[in-house]
Swiss-Prot record:
E.C. designation(s): 5.6.2.4
PTM annotation: Phosphorylated.
UniProt record similarity statement: Belongs to the papillomaviridae E1 protein family.
Keyword annotations: ATP-binding, DNA replication, DNA-binding, Early protein, Helicase, Host nucleus, Hydrolase, Isomerase, Isopeptide bond, Nucleotide-binding, Phosphoprotein, Ubl conjugation
Gene that this polypeptide is encoded by: E1
Motif Nuclear localization signal mapped to chain: 86-88
Residue ranges, annotated region (DNA-binding region): 179-345
UniProt keyword Phosphoprotein present: yes
Name of this protein: Replication protein E1
Covalent link Glycyl lysine isopeptide (Lys-Gly) (interchain with G-Cter in SUMO), residues: K551
Subunit: Can form hexamers. Interacts with E2 protein; this interaction increases E1 DNA binding specificity. Interacts with host DNA polymerase subunit POLA2. Interacts with host single stranded DNA-binding protein RPA1. Interacts with host TOP1; this interaction stimulates the enzymatic activity of TOP1.
Entry GO terms, CC: host cell nucleus
Amino acid sequence: MDDPEGTNGVGAGCTGWFEVEAVIERRTGDNISDDEDETADDSGTDLIEFIDDSVQSTTQAEAEAARALFNVQEGVDDINAVCALKRKFAACSESAVEDCVDRAANVCVSWKYKNKECTHRKRKIIELEDSGYGNTEVETEQMAHQVESQNGDADLNDSESSGVGASSDVSSETDVDSCNTVPLQNISNILHNSNTKATLLYKFKEAYGVSFMELVRPFKSDKTSCTDWCITGYGISPSVAESLKVLIKQHSIYTHLQCLTCDRGIILLLLIRFKCSKNRLTVAKLMSNLLSIPETCMIIEPPKLRSQACALYWFRTAMSNISDVQGTTPEWIDRLTVLQHSFNDDIFDLSEMIQWAYDNDITDDSDIAYKYAQLADVNSNAAAFLRSNAQAKIVKDCGVMCRHYKRAEKRGMTMGQWIQSRCEKTNDGGNWRPIVQFLRYQNIEFTAFLVAFKQFLQGVPKKSCMLLCGPANTGKSYFGMSLIHFLKGCIISYVNSKSHFWLQPLSDAKLGMIDDVTAISWTYIDDYMRNALDGNDISIDVKHRALVQLKCPPLIITSNTNAGKDSRWPYLHSRLTVFEFNNPFPFDANGNPVYKINDENWKSFFSRTWCKLGLIEEEDKENDGGNISTFKCSAGQNPRHIRS
């Protein structure tokens, strides 16, 4: 097969080399025929416009036209950008406002347009309703003026940009609307987040017809514990609300559950009494797990316990078909709704309060007020005390009367009766041996101690003052303080000797003690208190009263100085019964005292040595029960009716 013309092989393709062979029909010097005379008609017309001179001018014109078009396009883009920027900060359109109203808590703003053909258009706000976010009337008016001024600027900008062309406004309308929507959404979110609780309270009142804050008493601290809580939750699914009735049983004693529906879903109202006290943080965490909603969608506060209107609300709704009630009704609801409880709550009996303080041996005013107030849930008289406007006066009167009764009762008792009453108020289980072992450890003969202790308790003249002396850390104060604590005696200190009333506690005590007496104290005792050490009658200055004459109770004195042998105070030698403690007080490896002396051990000691101390009396020999009658400060009641 012949090769193709003009190629040098098929395999080379278009990229290969090829040879072109020219066909020569005429050579130089050949004669030219007449038919081919080139000069015959060579007028040059065929060479006209052979070279196109208009190419340069056309290219320049096209470049200038492209540049002008580019400038025009850039101008249009710049105008559109400026217009969009101006309209972005101008007031939103009426449709955008309506969309924002639906999202941002029903803020209704309507606009009225007048004189649209005029150059300067004005917009007036014809309606401004409450937004629900707590704005005052002044703030709403300021917002209205701001929107109006922004609309005026927007109209002016629109009129200025209209000269460029209406096509730019139409092309950027979608972008501008999207730009206007973004800031309105941000504002709506900010208002919603900053007023979450207000929105939830509004939705609750809209659904239930009653304010949630009227049913509760707000707690400022989240750490305050309480057994009764009132809880409202939002956005709960129906299945979760139904399952809550079963899940909450294991945590509560009483539950009152209500569920209503609104545009935010199911709104739950729960009154619950837990098995133990819980704070708000614990309750929020528990309910968030049970309801599957965040803690921000709940409001948790304790209910009002003294509001009769609130109690009636819970009482009436408990009988309706929208409530699910489980457990025993709390006592505060019964107290405020049952007629008999209301009658009883209005009566306060001071004698009942005094009897309670006397029976529980509470004489301090602060303890009386605090402990009696804790009984308000179970004692109607205590509840009436809390409702009284004269609680301070009642507490003061109760404390004064209780102290009067206790003082008179103590004065009417002998030393044996007083020790017996103290033993009755002390628990059993003590051992008297540590006391005896400690005395022997200090080289004190137990029999000699019993003889001296018997005279000491009986108040024998010149034998009613016991001195425990010796070096430091030998257990003198430990031994004396334990005895004073058991017999509920008084302690006087020389530091108050400048006061006229520093001996006043001795007027109400069966036993007294002066601890760590120094040389200056011994001098004062030697000068002014010899009669007191003798056990004779003395005169004591008592505050707000005339001088009181009484027999000084037995005194225990601890000192590092043995005044019974010191020559500086010779007149005290015969008035002091001295016991020396010379050995250091022993402790075990754990730092606990080897000889434990407490109230139980003293009770065992007195029970063991009762007869040897001469505390038995004639009434005890008859074995006819206690010789102290029970005190009653309230009048008895006759349960039977008096017949006419």
